[in-house]
């Protein structure tokens, strides 16, 4: 059994410095030298102590002050994460690929005491320097400091610990406030995933590594800095998705968190007999979106242990986990965790209650009240149904519903899943066009007729009220927000 901890202090002083001190914590591939660097937990913890010393020495009265990380995945990112928290600061994760309009809004909202950046230009370097030059800091500032001898206990269990921004598709992003209690309540679910892998392999001493290509401002990657230290396992951190095949061979990885586009790429390798390209990978953890059940079933029947996690930034990524590998249930998001409460509203909206629910949206009590009711239920905005075996299946997003004059409700995600099965379709968005259900399709110009024919055939299988009667084409990728989600407006 893996021991579940409930605070950052113990994670570093017990797990990193004692239980797993001789195990590898993090690996990085350096394209320039073609070398892999492996860092053991004891050395990782020593650098975390340096970071604590650095922040406490250079930011007076740091308790509660906002410190932003604005950079790509790196070892320094991981070290500063724990250093900021243990020193008493509030860690703010920012997406370096956002526009200056979005970044300046988020920076202005949190009013940071410091912004750590790697110095690379992601398109906003000049504006960042002009507006915040006096508080910009390099990522490796901690290296010049001696490790703090006595690790401080600065964090209240229910204090604000981390600020992460949602990736809204219809308006400004919101700052999600997460506490230590929020974060560590989720560790039970992540430890359970580890134990299920042990059961699957019939090996209670199983030690694995996870490859992460997702950016650290993405909760699915970031939370692994905490969860994998529970089992003394390693994170293999990608520097560039373009080096995927080389990195996953040079840094043997059994587990990988995936979004649909990555899962589809892995699926092609498996189905075309190129599984060896994936090295030791056997556990894709699917999160952040709805996945094609057939793709997951294909992976499961070809030796992969497919895990799905359902959650939101507002639930600290917690929610429901699905371990089912059978055709009937692999398309579900799971049966629910025993430490959370669930209910379906009359309109089908899924609601969740428990310790992982956020403190609220930063400086936005009105928006908080819209999603967390007086009884503590978080309204996910996702529509779902529950089958006779207790499995929850997502059916769409409440705010995306198209409501026809006839009163019928249309889930665009359902129709997008149908259109997306056409091989010529690269991306698509279903929306209301006047009084019609329409679809915007990104595909090659010479494939447009193929797509029209596919939609015509698909419509014949649908009820009249669900049929797509307007089709528009784009020869360019469809617009997305800073987190890569398709915009629907």
Go through each PLM region and give its residues.
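Conserved pre-ATP/AMP-binding loop-to-beta segment of ANL
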Residues: 21-24, 147-165, 171-172, 198-209
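Gly/Ser/Thr-rich phosphate-binding loop
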Residues: 254-258, 266-328, 341
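Conserved AMP-binding/adenylation subdomain of ANL enzymes
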Residues: 184-209, 216-257, 261-273, 280
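N-lobe entry segment of adenylate-forming
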Residues: 1-58, 63, 82
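AMP-binding/adenylate-forming catalytic core of the ANL superfamily
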Residues: 115, 344, 354, 359-360, ...
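Conserved AMP-binding/adenylate-forming
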Residues: 39, 52-98, 212-213
């Amino acid at each position: 059994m893996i021991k579940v901890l409930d605070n950052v202090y113990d994670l570093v002083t017990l797990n990193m410095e004692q239980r797993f001190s001789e195990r590898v914590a993090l690996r990085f591939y350096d394209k320039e030298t073609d070398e892999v660097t492996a860092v053991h937990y004891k050395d990782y913890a020593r650098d975390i102590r340096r970071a604590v010393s650095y922040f406490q020495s250079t930011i007076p009265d740091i308790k509660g002050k906002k410190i932003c990380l604005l950079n790509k995945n790196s070892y320094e990112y991981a070290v500063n994460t724990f250093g900021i928290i243990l020193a008493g600061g509030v860690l703010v994760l920012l997406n370096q690929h956002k526009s200056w309009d979005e970044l300046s809004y988020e920076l202005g909202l949190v009013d940071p005491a410091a912004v750590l950046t790697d110095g690379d230009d992601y398109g906003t370097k000049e504006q960042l320097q002009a507006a915040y030059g006096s508080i910009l800091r390099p990522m490796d500032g901690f290296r010049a400091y001696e490790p703090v001898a006595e690790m401080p206990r600065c964090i209240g269990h229910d204090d604000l610990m981390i600020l992460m921004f949602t990736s809204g598709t219809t308006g400004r992003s919101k700052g999600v406030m997460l506490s230590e209690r929020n974060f560590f309540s989720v560790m039970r679910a992540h430890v359970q995933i580890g134990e299920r892998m042990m059961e699957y392999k019939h090996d209670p001493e199983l030690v694995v590594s996870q490859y992460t290509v997702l950016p650290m401002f993405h909760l699915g990657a970031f939370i692994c800095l905490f969860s994998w230290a529970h089992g003394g396992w390693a994170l293999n951190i990608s520097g560039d998705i373009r080096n995927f095949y080389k990195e996953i061979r040079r840094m043997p990885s059994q587990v990988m968190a995936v979004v649909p586009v990555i899962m589809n790429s892995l699926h092609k390798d498996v189905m075309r007999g190129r599984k060896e390209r994936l090295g030791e990978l056997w556990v894709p953890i699917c999160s952040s979106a709805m996945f094609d059940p057939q793709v997951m079933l294909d992976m499961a029947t070809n030796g992969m242990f497919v895990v799905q996690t359902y959650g939101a930034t507002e639930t600290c990524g917690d929610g429901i986990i699905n371990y089912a590998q059978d055709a009937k249930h692999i398309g579900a998001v799971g049966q629910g965790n025993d430490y959370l409460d669930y209910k379906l509203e009359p309109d089908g909206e899924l609601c969740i209650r428990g310790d992982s629910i956020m403190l609220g949206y930063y400086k936005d009590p009105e928006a908080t009240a819209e999603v967390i009711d007086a009884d503590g239920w978080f309204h996910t905005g996702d529509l779902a149904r529950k089958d006779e075996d207790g499995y929850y299946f997502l059916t769409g997003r409440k705010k995306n519903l198209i409501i026809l004059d006839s009163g019928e409700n249309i889930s665009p995600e359902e129709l997008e899943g149908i259109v997306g099965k056409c091989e010529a379709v690269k991306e698509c968005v279903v929306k209301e066009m006047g009084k019609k259900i329409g679809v915007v399709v990104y595909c090659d110009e010479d494939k447009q007729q193929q797509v029209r024919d596919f939609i015509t055939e698909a419509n014949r299988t649908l009820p009249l009220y669900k049929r797509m009667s307007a089709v528009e084409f784009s020869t360019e990728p469809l617009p997305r927000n800073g987190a890569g989600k398709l915009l629907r407006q």
